[in-house]
């Protein structure tokens, strides 16, 4: 618990330190990025480097806050999540982008006229939106689980697997990917136990796979954890049986943070994997609402930090291309009006030049 408290204190300290006064540009921003994690900051970085006016609004609640380090990210493996984000914010600001601490309450309007309203009633206008708010991991309602999250209660073998290698690992069945999750963790330890929990024990091919890999399947509902000296030491079943374990893997229900988009008709839907809900997007990151893109865990629940950052950059590039197209169409329309209007200032100047010739300056 002390580790979680320390992490929370560090996050709050950053969040309050980042409460800055942002003076909105006269015509609003080209893009408001909602969410200041890896996807949002990398997207903002791309947009700022493309000379777009961009504002990042960050609620300061990153999904990976309980983790001690980010893993699987080249040249940054093991870096504390808060430190990585601090570097990202500095890079965005270095190119003229703005980062603001705040929580979005609602979004209204449409492309070229979105209004993003915060919970403290501040409001910002944007031509386009990039949604990178991530997701919330909803854990099973088992006493003690949330206090161990990100420590000895883990979910991703690629994010946390190395740290629990060769330990006594348990896998709590909570969804359709439970057997697959157990097989992945078997790669990291020869001592893996599969807890069926409220589901029926595996049968058929699934049972055969577990047996072939030496994974013991334990029936019965899990009632709680056994923690000794702030370390997980066992999993307690409802009948009182305790199975010694030092790490427990669980698949949470992953829920996209997207409720604030209801005002523009954009809502999260069930993910095809059955693991939670997400915002669906096309191959470019575009949502079904014109002018709105999304990237990172809000649309791809399984994305790690590197994947999320890459998705943010790619969506930002597509978004910038869309703005370039809009700017060009507006410029062409203005150009056509100018050359087609015989009484425009440009045409009158041209007529004067043709009539007066070289004497026009002396008239």
What are these regions (language model features)?
Residues 35, 132-134, 141, 172, ...:
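Short, well-ordered coil/turn residues at beta-beta hairpins
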Residues 23-24, 29-83, 167-168, 177-200, ...:
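Beta1-alpha1 glycine-rich phosphate/pyrophosphate-binding loop at the start
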Residues 181, 295-335:
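A conserved FAD-binding loop/helix module that cradles the flavin
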Residues 151-158, 171-181, 203-204:
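Active-site glycine-rich loop that binds ribose-phosphate moieties when present
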Residues 4, 9-31, 99-167, 247, ...:
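FAD-binding core/adjacent interface of flavoenzyme oxidoreductases
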């Amino acid at each position: 618990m002390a580790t979680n408290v320390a992490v929370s204190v560090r996050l709050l300290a950053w969040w309050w330190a980042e409460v800055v006064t942002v003076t909105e540009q006269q015509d609003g921003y080209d893009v408001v990025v909602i969410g200041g994690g890896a996807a949002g900051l990398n997207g903002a970085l791309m947009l700022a480097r493309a000379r777009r006016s961009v504002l990042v609004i960050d609620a300061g609640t990153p999904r990976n806050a309980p983790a001690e380090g980010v893993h699987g990210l080249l040249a940054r493996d093991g870096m504390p999540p808060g430190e990585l984000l601090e570097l990202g914010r500095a890079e965005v600001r270095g190119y003229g982008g703005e980062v603001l601490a705040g929580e979005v309450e609602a979004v209204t309007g449409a492309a070229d006229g979105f209004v993003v309203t915060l919970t403290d009633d501040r409001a910002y206008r944007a031509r386009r939106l990039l949604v990178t708010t991530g997701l919330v991991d909803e854990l099973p309602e088992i006493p003690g689980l949330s206090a161990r999250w990100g420590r000895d209660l883990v979910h991703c073998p690629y994010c946390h697997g190395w740290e629990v290698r060769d330990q006594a690992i348990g896998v709590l069945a909570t969804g359709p990917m439970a057997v697959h999750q157990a097989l992945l963790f078997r790669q990291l330890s020869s001592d893996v136990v599969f807890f069926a929990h409220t589901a029926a024990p595996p049968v058929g091919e699934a049972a055969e796979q577990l047996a072939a890999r030496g994974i013991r399947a334990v029936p019965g509902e899990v009632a709680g954890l056994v923690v000794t000296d702030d370390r997980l030491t066992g999993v307690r079943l409802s009948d009182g049986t305790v199975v010694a374990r030092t790490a427990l893997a669980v698949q949470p229900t992953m829920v996209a943070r997207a409720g604030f988009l209801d005002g523009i008709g954009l809502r999260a839907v069930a993910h095809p994997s059955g693991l939670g809900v997400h915002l669906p997007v096309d191959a470019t990151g575009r949502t079904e609402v014109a002018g709105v893109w999304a990237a990172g865990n809000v649309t791809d629940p399984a994305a790690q930090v590197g994947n999320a950052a890459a998705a943010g950059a790619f969506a930002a590039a597509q978004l910038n291309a869309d703005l370039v197209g809009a700017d060009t169409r507006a410029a062409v329309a203005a150009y056509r009006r100018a050359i087609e209007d015989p009484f425009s200032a440009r045409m009158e100047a041209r007529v004067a030049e043709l009539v007066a010739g070289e004497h026009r300056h002396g008239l």
